[in-house]
From Swiss-Prot:
<keyword id="KW-0808">Transferase</keyword>
<dbReference type="GO" id="GO:0006782">
    <property type="term" value="P:protoporphyrinogen IX biosynthetic process"/>
</dbReference>
<keyword id="KW-0627">Porphyrin biosynthesis</keyword>
<dbReference type="GO" id="GO:0005737">
    <property type="term" value="C:cytoplasm"/>
</dbReference>
<dbReference type="GO" id="GO:0004418">
    <property type="term" value="F:hydroxymethylbilane synthase activity"/>
</dbReference>
<dbReference type="InterPro" id="IPR022419">
    <property type="entry name" value="Porphobilin_deaminase_cofac_BS"/>
</dbReference>
<comment type="similarity">
    <text>Belongs to the HMBS family.</text>
</comment>
<dbReference type="Pfam" id="PF01379">
    <property type="entry name" value="Porphobil_deam"/>
</dbReference>
<comment type="pathway">
    <text>Porphyrin-containing compound metabolism; protoporphyrin-IX biosynthesis; coproporphyrinogen-III from 5-aminolevulinate: step 2/4.</text>
</comment>
<comment type="function">
    <text>Tetrapolymerization of the monopyrrole PBG into the hydroxymethylbilane pre-uroporphyrinogen in several discrete steps.</text>
</comment>
<dbReference type="InterPro" id="IPR036803">
    <property type="entry name" value="Porphobilinogen_deaminase_C_sf"/>
</dbReference>
<dbReference type="Pfam" id="PF03900">
    <property type="entry name" value="Porphobil_deamC"/>
</dbReference>
<comment type="subunit">
    <text>Monomer.</text>
</comment>
<dbReference type="InterPro" id="IPR000860">
    <property type="entry name" value="HemC"/>
</dbReference>
<dbReference type="InterPro" id="IPR022418">
    <property type="entry name" value="Porphobilinogen_deaminase_C"/>
</dbReference>
<feature type="modified residue" description="S-(dipyrrolylmethanemethyl)cysteine">
    <location>
        <position position="249"/>
    </location>
</feature>
<protein>
    <recommendedName>
        <fullName>Porphobilinogen deaminase</fullName>
        <ecNumber>2.5.1.61</ecNumber>
    </recommendedName>
</protein>
Length: 316
């Protein structure tokens, strides 16, 4: 777009280098190429190693929580070495640098989690004392809520690494996002899909977000061509809900918004890490009020749980 030369690079995407992150970046690139009728090769992809990729020996909530998978990419964006970033929405902090924003989300993939185990057909089929490996506090807490007789431990790594760890017995089972398996062509690895009414997904799960500089009119117009309005509405409710709670990785939080025409249905949950204390709420309302409904749901749960609920786990 800086030149009429058909071989010039139009824009550079910044992304993590994991297979899933690269699959997401290529999906964005291909959609942009179709929307603007240009060769995909004219949109470059630059991989950036993040803190979350480098630190594999500790749980995320012990080393900074959210932002670990975006910080270095945002730094490249602000420095101008990339034109926009592609993220998994659930990795994006609720508060962005002042100079950046999320101008577009791709159409949302399946939001559900999946149960994976070589030993059992479902979470309920695992024997007492079996170990479920997951680095997600939300998943750990919900496993313990449903099956307090199970053990949970941290299982880090990209999708393929976690699948390998399960296959060699580092845990009896794990939980992953179905969206990630679908994007990698690994959906056949799912033992059982967990419905949202029993296992509420993470805020933003299944949605690919594009982050750009607010003042870059050229790039903002470029990426908005592939934005999905329904996903944007759903994420506005979910992210406003998260922003008013503990938006780090220290408090297990689930949230999911469904968009039905000009109406939305939202469900939100906060839960203690051991699964014994939880608060849930729902909201229905106009699509135009999505952000306000998410915020209202958060205010209700914060009031019901009390500040002690959040301060107790902030230091956990």
């Amino acid at each position: 777009m800086q030149s009429s030369d058909e071989t010039d690079i139009l824009a550079t995407i910044g992304t993590r280098g994991s297979p899933l992150a690269l699959a997401q970046a290529h999906e964005v690139r291909d959609r942009l190429a179709r929307a603007h009728q240009v060769a995909p090769e004219r949109i470059a992809i630059k991989t950036i190693r993040t803190s979350g990729d480098a630190i594999q020996d500790r749980p995320l909530f012990d080393v900074g929580g959210k932002g670990l998978f975006t910080k270095e990419i945002e730094e490249a964006l602000l420095a101008g070495t990339i034109d926009f970033a592609v993220h998994s929405s659930k990795d994006v902090p609720t508060f962005l640098p002042d100079a950046t924003w999320l101008p577009a989300f791709l159409p949302r993939e399946d939001v559900r989690d999946v149960f994976i185990s070589p030993h059992a057909g479902s979470l309920n089929d695992l024997p007492a004392g079996a170990t479920v490996g997951t680095a997600s506090l939300r998943r750990q807490a919900m496993v313990l809520k449903l099956r307090p007789d199970l053990k949970v431990n941290s299982l880090r790594g990209n999708v393929e690494t976690r699948l390998r760890k399960i296959s060699v017995g580092e845990a009896d089972a794990t939980l992953l996002a179905l969206a990630g398996l679908n994007r990698l062509g690994l959906q056949d690895k799912a033992t059982r899909i967990l419905e949202t009414d029993e296992f509420l997904p993470a805020v933003g799960q299944g949605a690919i977000a594009i982050e750009s500089r607010r003042d870059d009119d050229r790039i903002n117009a470029f990426v908005k061509a592939i934005g999905d309005p329904e996903t944007e509405v759903a994420l506005s409710a979910e992210r406003s809900f998260l922003a008013l709670l503990d938006g780090s990785c220290r408090t297990p939080i689930g949230g999911h918004c469904r968009v039905n025409g000009d109406r939305i249905d939202f469900r939100g949950l906060i839960i203690s890490p051991d699964g014994t204390e939880f608060y849930e709420t729902t909201r229905e309302g106009a699509r135009a009020d999505a952000a306000a409904l998410g915020a209202d749901a958060a205010h209700e749960l914060r009031e019901r749980a009390g500040e002690k609920f959040f301060t107790l786990f902030a230091g956990a």
